[in-house]
UniProtKB/Swiss-Prot annotation:
Substrate binds at N11, K13. Pathway: Carbohydrate degradation; glycolysis; D-glyceraldehyde 3-phosphate from glycerone phosphate: step 1/1; Carbohydrate biosynthesis; gluconeogenesis. This is Triosephosphate isomerase. Triosephosphate isomerase is an extremely efficient metabolic enzyme that catalyzes the interconversion between dihydroxyacetone phosphate (DHAP) and D-glyceraldehyde-3-phosphate (G3P) in glycolysis and gluconeogenesis. Keywords: Cytoplasm, Gluconeogenesis, Glycolysis, Isomerase, Lyase. It catalyses: dihydroxyacetone phosphate = methylglyoxal + phosphate; D-glyceraldehyde 3-phosphate = dihydroxyacetone phosphate. Its EC number is 5.3.1.1, 4.2.3.3. Belongs to the triosephosphate isomerase family. Homodimer. Transmembrane segments: none annotated. The gene is tpi1. The lineage of its organism: Eukaryota, Metazoa, Chordata, Craniata, Vertebrata. The active site is at H95, E165. The keyword Lyase applies.
């Protein structure tokens, strides 16, 4: 049995308003949540304060992105200092939508990781291949390069969670089979052992994202190297509670 605490992040993406999020938060607050699982809710920037005020203390709050410096003339951006000021303690960085919709590079993501960690904000660092890359047989090459860009900027791994999200399985209804997901998670752990340290490889949580639902979570969560989930669409529904409790 792994000593790594199960970690479930809900990425609300650009969804919700105060009315619908209040309903969701009330459902989460009244739900029976496993004490053995760390739960983080990724709210839209404009609702970080709102989410932190309304969610019970057993839930942490995460931003979905931040910039690589503390302040300045960067219109539309937010800093880790602002995230903390809202009572949030995590940030999602390198999500495939940031990479592929907004053109963020490995280098920029690495710089963001370094700055967030220097400000003591926890990082959920996302990696994952696109369908054409998987079909070309370069899944490992892609995810190792993305992981290296993150790892090169990490001094203290206790504040980092890695999220493997095969891009072809995000919001598509396609899910990597538990075996496919486990295979990549195992390879990532081996990469960490070789390139960072055995201790980090054993302790860092590697979570899975990509169309995780109440129906798929138990089998995925049973894999030895899958330490939780980063959940998109299903995190806005009551079934998020089932996903949080996947190990029960």
């Amino acid at each position: 049995m792994s000593s790594r605490k199960f970690f479930v992040g809900g990425n609300w993406k650009m969804n919700g308003d105060k009315k619908s999020l209040t309903e969701l938060i009330n459902t989460l607050n009244s739900g029976k949540i496993s004490a053995d699982t760390e739960v983080v809710c990724g709210a839209p920037t404009i609702y970080l304060d709102f989410a932190r005020q309304k969610l019970d203390a057993k839930f942490a709050v995460s931003a979905q992105n931040c910039y690589k410096v503390a302040k300045g003339a960067f219109t539309g951006e937010i800093s880790p200092a602002m995230i903390k000021d809202c009572g949030a303690t995590w940030v999602i960085l390198g999500h495939s939508e940031r990479r592929h919709v907004f053109g963020e590079s490995d280098e920029l993501i690495g710089q963001k990781v370094a700055h967030a960690l220097s400000e003591n904000v926890g990082v959920i660092g996302c990696i994952g291949e696109k369908l054409d890359q998987r079909e070309a047989g370069i899944t490992e090459k892609v995810v190792f390069e993305q992981t290296k860009a993150i790892a090169d900027n990490v001094k203290d791994w206790s504040k980092v969670v890695l999220a493997y999200e095969p891009v072809w399985a995000i919001g598509t209804g396609k899910t990597a089979t538990p075996e496919q997901a486990q295979e990549v998670h195992k390879k990532l752990r081996e990469w960490l052992k070789t390139n960072v340290s055995e201790d980090v490889a054993k302790s860092v949580r590697i979570i899975y994202g990509g169309s995780v639902t109440g129906g798929t979570c138990k089998e995925l969560g049973a894999q030895p190297d899958i330490d939780g989930f980063l959940v998109g669409g299903a995190s806005l529904k009551p079934e998020f509670i089932d996903i949080i409790n996947a190990k029960q």
